[in-house]
C-alpha cells in the first residue's frame, strides 16, 4: 500500500467550510489567497444562493459551476506552462493553485450533499465503543494514539472481511498466498526507496516535547496571519507564495521560514525546535549486537518482490501470475487521528500481479466489462468535472483506463467492496494526477469512499511497472526476470568482458569479487567504449561500491561472438491492488449504520450476511426451561453447519433482545417460542434484521437456510417466497408446564 497513502484532512477542511458563512464561501480567494502572478487565474465568485442546506441538482450545479470553471482554467494553465517548458517554480505554483481550487470545489460538493446522506458519526461511534467493536489500545494506561484493539464483534467482522477477500481474490484468481516477516533489514527498504522518501519534516515543542508535522503547522500559522485584517497586501502576497511551494521546501528552508514568521507551538505558545526529517517507519536493530538496522515493514509488498524467483519457479516459470499477502504494516505517523482512518499499525491485503509488459491483456476482463461505476480521471479533475459513471469496457476502449489488466482489477475491487457493505453510490475510482504519483508508480487509481470525513482512499490500484524488481536486481546482482519463449529462434551478436580471474585476484585480493560482479553486468555500449580506452591507453578505470579500480590489458579482454536465442528475458510489470482493511471496515461502519424509523434510540448495522460478525442469534422467548432443549439442539446444529451464532437467553423482552443483536449487526434471529414446544413438527421463527420480517420453518431446516443466506446462495426474498410469514403465536404459556 500500498501502499495506500491517506487523503489528508479532507474531512476537516470540509467541516471547516461548512461552518463558514455563505459570503466567505462565495469568495474562495479569501480562504486561499493565492495570487500567483503568471501561475493563477482571475478570482471566482459564487451566486448568493450558496448555503449550508442541501439543494436540488440544478441549484447545486449553479453554485458549483463557477468553481468548476476556475479549476478548468487553472488546469489549462498548468498544461500550457508544461508545454512551454516554463520554469519549474512557476509550474509548482500553478499546480499548488490547482490543488487549492480542487479542494474548494470538493468541499462545496460535500457541503451541498443531502442531509440524510450524512451519518450521525457521534451516535455511530458511541455504538461502536459501547458494544466494543474496537477501542483505543492500552486504555487503562491512558491509551496510545493511532493504536487500537478490536473487541469480539470487531474482530469477528474483520476476520469475515478478510475471509471474504481470500475467497473473492485468492481462490477466484488462483493467487499464490505467502506470509513474510514483518521485520525488514534496512538495505531492502533503502533499495525500495522507503528509507529516503518515506519521511516528513517534524518540529518539537522545546519544553514538553510535543511533536508537529512542520508543513502542516507552518500552513496553519500562515493562514492565521493572513486572516488578520492588519496584514498588508504585500505580506499576504509573500505568504501566498510560500504556501504555493510548501511541498517543495527542504529542511533548511523550512527552518528559515519558521524563524521568519515566528512560528510557535499552537498548544502552549512555546518555542519550537528546528525541523528534522522524520522517517515514518519504525526503526529497530536485529540481533543483540545492534549492528543490523531494520524496520517494521511499511507495506507487505516488498516480501513478495524479494520472493519473486521462488514464486515464478512455483508457477512453472510462466507469466502472468499473482501473489498476495495479508498482514500488519506499520507507519509511525506524527499525528494520527480520525479513528481507524489514520493509524500507526494496520492490516493490509496486497496483490502483486506480474505480467509481461508487452501483453497487458487480461483473459477474464469481459467478466467485468459491463460493470458501471464512477470513474474520476486525472483529466476530469483538472477540468473541474465530477466523477462520471461509465461502463468499464468503454473506459478501457476510450483510454481512460490504460489496459485490461488494470481494468479487470478495478472491476474486481468494485465487486468486493460492494459485497462487504460499501454503498456503490458512495464509491468512486480516482486516478492519481502526475504530481501525486508515488515514487514507484506509473499509473494509479484509488478506490475512494464518501464518509463523514469526506472522500477517503481505501484501496490503491497501481501500475508499478518494473520499478521494484529492477531496483532489487541492481542492488543484489540477482536477475529478477522471467523467460519468454520466442516464436522463432534468433541469432544475436554478443559483446562481453573476459576478465582474468588470476590477475584481478592478485591485484585486488578481497575486492576482486566486486570487480568481477561489476564487469558481468556491463552493457555493449560501455564495453565498446572501455575497449577503445584499453587499446589507446592500455588501461581503464571502473568505480563500484564507492571504490575505484584500474584494469590493464593483462587483466581483461573483450570477447565477441554470436549466440542463438530460444527465449528472451523480460522484467515483469506489476499491477498492485493494495487494500487498507481498517479503512474498509470504517467505511462499512458508516455505510451500514442506521436508526430505526420512529425510534431514535434503536440503532443497527446492516452488515451483509457474508461479513456479519454473527450470522444469526438464537433467542428463547423467555427463560422458561421448556425452551432450553430446543436452544441447545439448534445451537449444535448451527455449529455443525459452520454458522457463527450468538445465544441470548438473558432476561428482558424479546424486542429488547432483538434490538441488542441488531445493534451489533447480527443478520438473522431464530426465536424459540411456545409454538416450538407445543406443536409438531417443531418449528421456530427466523427474523431478518433489516426488514424485521419473520418466517416460520422447521427447526431441522433452519441451519441450512441460515447457512445459504450467509453464503449468498439465496436471498431473504427467496426465503419469504418459500416459507409462510410469521404473524403471531398460535399457542401460549398456559398450554405448557408452569415455570
From Swiss-Prot:
Kindly indicate whether the keyword Acetylation belongs to this entry: yes
- In the record, which positions carry Phosphotyrosine? 453
**Annotated family:** Belongs to the class-II aminoacyl-tRNA synthetase family.
Q: Which InterPro entries match?
A: aa-tRNA-synt_IIb, aa-tRNA-synth_II, aa-tRNA-synth_II/BPL/LPL, Anticodon-bd, Anticodon-bd_dom_sf, Gly-tRNA_synthase/POLG2, GlyRS-like_core, tRNA-synt_gly
According to the UniProt entry, which disease involves this protein?
Charcot-Marie-Tooth disease, axonal, type 2D: A dominant axonal form of Charcot-Marie-Tooth disease, a disorder of the peripheral nervous system, characterized by progressive weakness and atrophy, initially of the peroneal muscles and later of the distal muscles of the arms. Charcot-Marie-Tooth disease is classified in two main groups on the basis of electrophysiologic properties and histopathology: primary peripheral demyelinating neuropathies (designated CMT1 when they are dominantly inherited) and primary peripheral axonal neuropathies (CMT2). Neuronopathy, distal hereditary motor, autosomal dominant 5: A form of distal hereditary motor neuronopathy, a heterogeneous group of neuromuscular disorders caused by selective degeneration of motor neurons in the anterior horn of the spinal cord, without sensory deficit in the posterior horn. The overall clinical picture consists of a classical distal muscular atrophy syndrome in the legs without clinical sensory loss. The disease starts with weakness and wasting of distal muscles of the anterior tibial and peroneal compartments of the legs.
Protein name listed in UniProt: Glycine--tRNA ligase
- Tell me the outcome of changing residue 602 to A: Decrease in catalytic activity by more than 10-fold
Q: Which organism is it from?
A: Homo sapiens (Human)
Q: Which gene encodes it?
A: GARS1
Q: Where does ATP bind?
A: 331-333, 342-343, 457-458, 583
Q: Where in the cell is it found?
A: Cytoplasm; Cell projection, Axon; Secreted; Secreted, Extracellular exosome
Amino acid at each position: 500500500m500500498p501502499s495506500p497513502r491517506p487523503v489528508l484532512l479532507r474531512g476537516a477542511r470540509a467541516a471547516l467550510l461548512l461552518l463558514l458563512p455563505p459570503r466567505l464561501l462565495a469568495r474562495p480567494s479569501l480562504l486561499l489567497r493565492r495570487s500567483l502572478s503568471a501561475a493563477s487565474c482571475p478570482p471566482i465568485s459564487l451566486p448568493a444562493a450558496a448555503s449550508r442546506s442541501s439543494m436540488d441538482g440544478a441549484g447545486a450545479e449553479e453554485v458549483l459551476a463557477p468553481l468548476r470553471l476556475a479549476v478548468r482554467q487553472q488546469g489549462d494553465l498548468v498544461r500550457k506552462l508544461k508545454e512551454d517548458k516554463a520554469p519549474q517554480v512557476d509550474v509548482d505554483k500553478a499546480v499548488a493553485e490547482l490543488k487549492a481550487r480542487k479542494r474548494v470545489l470538493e468541499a462545496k460538493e460535500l457541503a451541498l450533499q443531502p442531509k440524510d446522506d450524512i451519518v450521525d458519526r457521534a451516535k455511530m461511534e458511541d455504538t461502536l465503543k459501547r458494544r466494543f467493536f474496537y477501542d483505543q489500545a492500552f486504555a487503562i494506561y491512558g491509551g496510545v494514539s493511532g493504536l487500537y484493539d478490536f473487541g469480539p464483534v470487531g474482530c469477528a467482522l474483520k476476520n469475515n472481511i478478510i475471509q471474504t477477500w481470500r475467497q473473492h481474490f485468492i481462490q477466484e484468481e488462483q493467487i499464490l498466498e505467502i506470509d513474510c516477516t514483518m521485520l525488514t533489514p534496512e538495505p531492502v527498504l533503502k533499495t525500495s526507496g522507503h528509507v529516503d522518501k518515506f519521511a516528513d519534516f517534524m518540529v518539537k515543542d522545546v519544553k514538553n516535547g510535543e511533536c508537529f508535522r512542520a508543513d502542516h503547522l507552518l500552513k496553519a500559522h500562515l493562514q492565521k496571519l493572513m486572516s488578520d485584517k492588519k496584514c498588508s497586501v504585500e505580506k499576504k502576497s509573500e505568504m501566498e507564495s510560500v504556501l504555493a511551494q510548501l511541498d517543495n521546501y527542504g529542511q533548511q528552508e523550512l527552518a528559515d521560514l519558521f524563524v521568519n514568521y515566528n512560528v510557535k507551538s499552537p498548544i502552549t505558545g512555546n518555542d519550537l525546535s528546528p525541523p528534522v526529517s522524520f522517517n515514518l517507519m519504525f526503526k529497530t536493530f536485529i540481533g543483540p549486537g545492534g549492528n543490523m538496522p531494520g524496520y517494521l515493514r511499511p507495506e507487505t509488498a516488498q516480501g513478495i518482490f524479494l520472493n519473486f524467483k521462488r514464486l515464478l519457479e512455483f508457477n512453472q516459470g510462466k507469466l502472468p501470475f499473482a501473489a498476495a499477502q495479508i498482514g500488519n504494516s506499520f507507519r509511525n505517523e506524527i499525528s494520527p487521528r480520525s479513528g481507524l482512518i489514520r493509524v500507526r499499525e494496520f492490516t493490509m491485503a496486497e496483490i502483486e500481479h506480474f505480467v509481461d509488459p508487452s501483453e497487458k491483456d487480461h483473459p477474464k476482463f469481459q467478466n467485468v466489462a459491463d460493470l458501471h461505476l464512477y470513474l474520476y480521471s486525472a483529466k476530469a479533475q483538472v477540468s473541474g468535472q465530477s466523477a462520471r459513471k461509465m461502463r468499464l469496457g468503454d473506459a478501457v476502449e476510450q483510454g481512460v483506463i490504460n489496459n485490461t489488466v488494470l481494468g479487470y482489477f478495478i472491476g474486481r475491487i468494485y465487486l468486493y467492496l460492494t459485497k462487504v457493505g460499501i454503498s456503490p453510490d458512495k464509491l468512486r475510482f480516482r486516478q492519481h494526477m502526475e504530481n501525486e504519483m508515488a515514487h514507484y508508480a506509473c499509473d494509479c487509481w484509488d478506490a475512494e469512499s464518501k464518509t463523514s470525513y469526506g472522500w477517503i482512499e481505501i484501496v490503491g490500484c497501481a501500475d508499478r511497472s518494473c520499478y521494484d524488481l529492477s531496483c532489487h536486481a541492481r542492488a543484489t546482482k540477482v536477475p529478477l526476470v522471467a523467460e519468454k519463449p520466442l516464436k522463432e529462434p534468433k541469432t544475436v551478436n554478443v559483446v562481453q568482458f573476459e576478465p582474468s580471474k588470476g590477475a584481478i585476484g592478485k591485484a585486488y585480493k578481497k575486492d576482486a569479487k566486486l570487480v568481477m560482479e561489476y564487469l558481468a553486468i556491463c552493457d555493449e555500449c560501455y564495453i565498446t567504449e572501455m575497449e577503445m580506452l584499453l587499446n589507446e591507453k592500455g588501461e581503464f578505470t571502473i568505480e563500484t561500491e564507492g571504490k575505484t579500480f584500474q584494469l590493464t590489458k593483462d587483466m581483461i579482454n573483450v570477447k565477441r561472438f554470436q549466440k542463438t536465442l530460444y527465449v528472451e528475458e523480460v522484467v515483469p510489470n506489476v499491477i498492485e491492488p493494495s487494500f487498507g482493511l481498517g479503512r474498509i471496515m470504517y467505511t462499512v461502519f458508516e455505510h451500514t449504520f442506521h436508526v430505526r424509523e420512529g425510534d431514535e434510540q434503536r440503532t443497527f448495522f446492516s452488515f451483509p450476511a457474508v461479513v456479519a460478525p454473527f450470522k444469526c442469534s438464537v433467542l428463547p422467548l423467555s427463560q422458561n426451561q421448556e425452551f432450553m432443549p430446543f436452544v441447545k439442539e439448534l445451537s449444535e446444529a448451527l455449529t455443525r453447519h459452520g454458522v457463527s451464532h450468538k445465544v441470548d437467553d438473558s432476561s428482558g423482552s424479546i424486542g429488547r433482545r432483538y434490538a441488542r443483536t441488531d445493534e451489533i449487526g447480527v443478520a438473522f434471529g431464530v426465536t424459540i417460542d411456545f409454538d416450538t414446544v407445543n406443536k409438531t413438527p417443531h418449528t421456530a421463527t427466523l427474523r431478518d434484521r433489516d426488514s424485521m420480517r419473520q418466517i416460520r420453518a422447521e427447526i431441522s431446516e433452519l441451519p441450512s437456510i441460515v447457512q445459504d443466506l450467509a453464503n449468498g446462495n439465496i436471498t431473504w426474498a427467496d426465503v419469504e417466497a418459500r416459507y409462510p410469514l410469521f404473524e403471531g403465536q398460535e399457542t401460549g404459556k398456559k398450554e405448557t408446564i408452569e415455570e
